[in-house]
UniProtKB/Swiss-Prot annotation:
Pathway: Amino-acid biosynthesis; L-leucine biosynthesis; L-leucine from 3-methyl-2-oxobutanoate: step 3/4. It comes from Chlorobium luteolum (strain DSM 273 / BCRC 81028 / 2530) (Pelodictyon luteolum). This is 3-isopropylmalate dehydrogenase. Its cofactor is Mg(2+); Mn(2+). The gene is leuB. The lineage of its organism: Bacteria, Pseudomonadati, Chlorobiota, Chlorobiia, Chlorobiales. Belongs to the isocitrate and isopropylmalate dehydrogenases family. LeuB type 1 subfamily.
Amino acid sequence: MYKIVSIPGDGIGPEVVAGALAVIRQITKKHGFEIQVEEHPFGGASYDLHGSMLTDETLNACRDCDAVLLGAVGGPKWENLPHEHKPEAALLKIRRELGLFANLRPAKVYDALVDASSLKADVVRGTDFMVFRELTGGIYFGEPRGFDEKRGWNTMVYEKHEVERIARLAFEAAQKRGSKRVMSIDKANVLEVSQFWRNEVHRVHRDFPDVELSDMYVDNAAMQIVRNPKQFDVIVTGNLFGDILSDIAGMITGSLGMLPSASIGRVHALYEPIHGSAPDIAGKNIANPIATIASVAMMFEHSFCMADISNEIHAAIEGALSEGLRTADIAAPGQKSVSTTEMTEGIIRHLGA
């Protein structure tokens, strides 16, 4: 039996998580195994109840489970709190306390939605790649950092173990995905830290002789992702470059409501849609649950090692979309849109009994 901690959070978080949990219930019923779900408050919802965005009880529950499912955090109600009490600080803390060092962001275009992309349909059709972004090092955390009246400074630094563990994760994923290709993204032509990154990735690659490794400069990668996204399978890169490239890749799909993510550590993992809490549509039952449901698909693949069930969920999403179901964010002008609940029910219907 697996144990999931559900932290729905704020805004549309509870609505999209409810849809994802309904999918989990259908999967366990269909395949005859059990998943225990334990819900805890997080973010603004937790602050309103307990005066803390992340209570010790919630954190301990997240430590004592197989996977964490997060909805969304934040909203205007809590924007004026001190930085250390803001929802974003709680999210950084939970990632740090769980030892999450890799962010996984898939860029998958469903056939039924090729026309929703801002790129031409023939460019994006068949796109299916994964960005592995290192989360704990690089310029976001390097010291020294600061600014005065005359200058500002930051330090981009990577330790050997930080590069090794993210590279190893990417190579292992490439082996499982079948095409066995990894593209390492850096700026080794001008940055010494990128030269170090490249050397370490190539050193780790010696343990994976069946995987093809290529290198690409980050500026070229940004261009290639929108020019020919199908050329990529697994991308591995540092914190700053990954932050930028994963957002570029994400827009290929046509809506933030389609984009799942996973943050992975040696023991723990947290799964969440990349969209925000969208307080303007919260409680209206119109949010797109697909990103959260696709995050559950990632959970089955990476935490539970059930790639077949992950594929089932993606196929059910594709089936619902092919049927013509669209929430408002992915509906074409004049096209009828469905509710959060209706989209969830459509996906469950395509999962089968």
